[in-house]
Curated annotation (Swiss-Prot):
Gene3D superfamilies: Glycosidases (3.20.20.80), Golgi alpha-mannosidase II (2.60.40.1180)
Family that this chain belongs to: Belongs to the glycosyl hydrolase 13 family.
Protein name: Alpha-amylase-related protein
Signal sequence, renumbered to the chain: 1-19
Subunit structure: Monomer.
Entry note: cofactor: Binds 1 Ca(2+) ion per subunit.
Disulfide bonds: C47-C103, C156-C170, C375-C381, C417-C440, C447-C459
EC number(s) from the headed UniProt entry: 3.2.1.1
């Protein structure tokens, strides 16, 4: 009897973990965008007017819980919780709920960045949060939850990143470290997440997951409610979970400890794609991209060119400030069949702490758009760049196809097909790519969705004529604006 019960428990746990890898996308949509620091009602409008029509699958939103108010309002204040009240500079609970409903209604899922590892760091005296709640972080007193000192790990600093105890029980950059093995802490975290599920979210990005023991997270995840069927989710659907685990290889706390609980952020993807498109690696090596590079299995990897953290760091990672290689890397990311894709939508920054665009009263301002739909007034909105949203459409058009017809010049000119539905070519050399290449597409004329759009049957950019054998003449000049060309069956002239 014990053996039967134990086996049943293992089967149920395994089923739950597999379910937590499902992002619950509509139809053939399969790309998430991180609308970093956007306000809730602005996201609702963006879902309806841009994201749904362009085929985006979901939005990662900034933390929703009340946070500390820091001088100058740096972006990272959102990662310093005071309580689990749903009031931030992005809006209140009513506005959040409206956003979730409106986005779900047009098939765009919402994933919340959640902070389960910690509360706010030290603050001189009494701290006040964005909902007006007071706390004394130095005393580990957070009455808005409530938490007191007994709910936290003892104070210590992470000085040795090879020491598991320090990584998981000491304070990450001084943030008060919650004890997730405590029944009380677990109950408050589950209550917080369940409330978001009730409001209709599809899942969670779990911040700083490697700083929490995987067995504690497994308990919390398995205790969550199923997704809300009133928002269009099937019965017994589990929340999609993707966990921030920074693992460059040979880490004491490994990504592999978390991958069965949900998807895991594949930071090596971000670093290596940056290396390649900065010219530090020949593009020909990308033929074995993905698990061939030692990355996580595709269905367990949350992939990205940059995120809100590493785009602010020096190193190989690309960001909007290097637009040509960034667009090329994004095109490859969305064309190659590996991982659960997320694209970044940023605001302009001059230093690590730059706040989102705000007015004189430190209120976040809404993005504004020019005649071409691009963002102005301090918002970058990479997701509105044609070269990015067009590749979201490409990824939708070629879903469930494999790589075929790989070609390279032995260096950094490459092309490949996605079945008979799509074709991508990239030129990262200092000389032109001019070649008859196999596009694998049916005969006809196709619009290059990178350089233009198909409007009323006409292409506003380059077009490529494909012959009866699937070949077309491909030209990408070394000084071309984008360095990439993309064709697919939904862009046939």
């Amino acid at each position: 009897m014990f053996k039967l019960a134990f086996t049943l428990t293992l089967c149920l746990a395994g089923g739950l973990s597999l379910a937590q890898h499902n992002p619950h996308w509509w139809g053939n949509r399969n790309t998430i965008v991180h609308l970093f620091e956007w306000k809730w009602l602005d996201i609702a409008q963006e879902c309806e007017s841009f994201l749904a029509p362009r085929g985006f699958a979901g939005v990662q939103v900034s933390p929703v819980n009340e946070n500390i108010i820091s001088a100058g309002r740096p972006w990272w204040e959102r990662y310093q919780p005071i309580s689990y009240k749903l009031t931030t500079r992005s809006g209140n609970e009513e506005e959040f709920g409206e956003m979730v409903r409106r986005c779900n209604d047009v098939g765009v899922r919402i994933y919340v960045d959640v902070l389960l590892n910690h509360m706010s760091g030290d603050f001189d005296g009494v701290a006040v949060g964005t909902a007006g709640t007071q706390a004394e972080p130095r005393k580990k007193s957070f009455p808005g939850v409530p938490y007191s000192a007994q709910d936290f790990h003892p104070t210590c600093e992470i000085t040795d990143w090879n020491d598991r105890f320090q990584v998981q029980q000491c304070e990450l950059v001084g943030l008060k470290d919650l004890n997730q093995s405590s029944d009380w802490v677990r109950s408050k975290l589950i209550e917080f997440l369940d409330h978001l599920i009730e409001l209709g979210v599809a899942g969670f990005r779990v911040d700083a997951a490697k700083h929490m023991a995987s067995e504690d997270l497994e308990y919390i995840y398995s205790s969550l409610s199923n997704l809300n069927i009133a928002h269009g989710f099937p019965h017994n659907s589990r929340p999609f979970i993707f966990q921030e685990v920074i693992d460059h290889g040979h880490e004491t706390v490994s990504r592999d400890e978390y991958r069965d609980l949900g998807a895991v952020t594949e930071f090596r993807f971000s670093e290596e794609i940056g290396n390649a498109f900065r010219g530090n690696n020949a593009l020909k090596w990308l033929q074995s991209w993905g698990t061939g590079w030692g990355f996580l299995p595709s269905g367990q990897a949350l992939t990205f060119v940059d995120n809100h953290d590493n785009q602010r760091d020096a190193g190989a990672v690309l960001n909007y400030k290097s637009p040509k290689p960034y667009k090329m890397a994004t095109a490859f990311h969305l064309a190659y069949p590996y991982g659960i894709s997320r694209v970044m939508s940023s605001f302009a920054f001059d230093d690590h702490d730059t706040p989102p665009p705000q007015d004189a009263q430190e209120r976040i301002i809404s993005p504004e758009f020019d005649a071409d739909g691009a963002c102005v007034n301090g918002w970058i909105c990479e997701h509105r760049w044609r070269q990015v949203y067009a590749m979201v459409g490409f990824k939708n058009a070629v879903r469930d196809t494999e790589i075929t017809g790989w070609w390279d010049n032995g260096d950094s000119q490459i092309s490949f097909c996605r079945g008979t539905k799509g074709f991508l070519a990239l030129n990262n050399n200092l000389y032109d790519l001019s070649q008859d290449l196999n596009t694998c597409l049916p005969a006809g004329t196709y619009c290059d969705v990178i350089s233009g759009s198909l409007i009323d049957g006409s292409c506003t950019g380059k077009s490529v004529t494909v012959n009866e054998h699937g070949y077309g003449y491909i030209h990408i000049g070394s000084d071309d604006f984008d360095g990439v060309l993309a064709l697919h069956v939904d862009a046939k002239v």
